Amino acid sequence: MPDTIEPTHGPSQIQHKITLPKDATVLVVEENVSNFVLIARMLGYLGIHCEWKTSGYEVVEYADTLPRLDLILMDIRLPYEDGYGALKKIRAAERLKSIPIVAVTAEASMEQMDKARASGFDGFLGKPLDPDRFPDQIRRILSGEPVWEMS
């Protein structure tokens, strides 16, 4: 049974329901601790379990050990192996190839968004992430809707 959260946004106090899969797990691949903490707190507010890796080369091996994985949020600029290289390896892993993978990057430009799309990412979120929009972006992604937004 899905959980429902009803956040209030902005001065107009617009409310909308955010329905999320129960016990969802998101793997965040982010080398910057402050960025990870922000993302983890926003996911925690939504009741989403969060795992963390700091580099692209660790992703496939680690993700394959998780009993459940609903989404990967991955920075593009990572040490040792960037998000594009990690994406190729994830897509080659049988168990992981259908997991949605969203690029999350401070290099938010149309050029980067187009490159991410052409490389096979399922979505794009530009940094800084907007805490007011993030819950709805995650809900949409987890419900199978592609999200391609600069910030």
Predicted regions and their residues:
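A Lys-centered signature of the CheY-like receiver
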Residues: 127
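Charged docking surfaces used in two-component/phosphorelay signaling
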Residues: 37-45
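Acidic, metal-coordinating helix/loop segments flanking the phosphotransfer/catalytic sites
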Residues: 52-71
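Active-site residues of response regulator receiver
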Residues: 75, 105
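Non-catalytic signal-transmission and effector/linker regions of two-component phosphorelay proteins
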Residues: 1-27, 31, 132-151
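The feature encodes the CheY-like receiver
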Residues: 79, 97, 109
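Short acidic/polar segment at the start of the alpha1 helix of CheY-like receiver
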Residues: 32-36
